[in-house]
Amino acid sequence: MLRVIIVDDEQPAREDLRERLNEEHGIEIVAECSNALEAIPAIQRLQPDVVFLDIQMPRINGLELASMLNPESMPHIVFVTAYDEYAIRAFEEHAFDYLLKPLDHQRLAKTLTRLSRDLIVKNNLHKVIKPILRHIPCSGHNRIFLLKIEEVEYLSSELSGVHVVGTVQSGYTQLSLKTLEEKTPFIRCHRQYMVNTEQLGEIQLMDNGAAEVITRSGKHIPVSRRYLKSLKEKLGIA
């Protein structure tokens, strides 16, 4: 699943790109931002795979925004603009691609294919070398502590951080859901939730196509339609 953030100060441009991306399989738009001040914390918090970024924006333009990101951890940047004179500067700022407005469907499709291939390579590499956490560093009630992986029931992304809900105690961690997805055996069941399958009691299916995970202790965790199929596959019940 390619996780995307759209950044453009023009609402019609965001809507056009959103509609085009929604026509493609394997893409999840995790956020839309109208300026750099909204985009920077969203990128840091959500850690998308790719940011489709306009260049001409007020106060902080797209090139300046890209230069503020850490090159070692930044997502792929695809600049989307009506001006071709920024191309050289864009690639100096580590651009993955540079698309001109109005968007050409075939050109966008080629970019998405390249992005998907790159994601597959990265995921395969992570499977080989990814370190697995044994504990999650948490804070709460004026103290810092470690929660064992096997004692965690589920994770939820909130404004104050990722809430780590355990069987005995709970807390908040500065690690992102994306990092925890890479470094723990937990399974994502929703854009904002991950579940420890060792603590899973049952899955209740709903008429609207969504579902709920119920942990052994009776806690209810939402499962979105987008993630239900992959959750069932990973549990061997597809």
Swiss-Prot record:
Domain Response regulatory: 3-116
Keywords for the protein's UniProt record, in alphabetical order: DNA-binding, Phosphoprotein, Transcription, Transcription regulation, Two-component regulatory system
Domain of life: Bacteria
Keyword Transcription: yes
An annotated GO BP: regulation of DNA-templated transcription
A Pfam family this chain is assigned to: LytTR
Record-annotated membrane-spanning stretches: none
Annotated GO MF terms: phosphorelay response regulator activity; transcription cis-regulatory region binding
Gene Ontology cellular-component terms listed: cytosol; protein-DNA complex
HTH LytTR-type domain sequence ranges: 136-237
Residues with 4-aspartylphosphate modification: 54
PANTHER family, per the entry: STAGE 0 SPORULATION PROTEIN A HOMOLOG, TRANSCRIPTIONAL REGULATOR-RELATED
Protein name: Uncharacterized response regulatory protein YPO3287/y0902/YP_0397
Provenance organism: Yersinia pestis
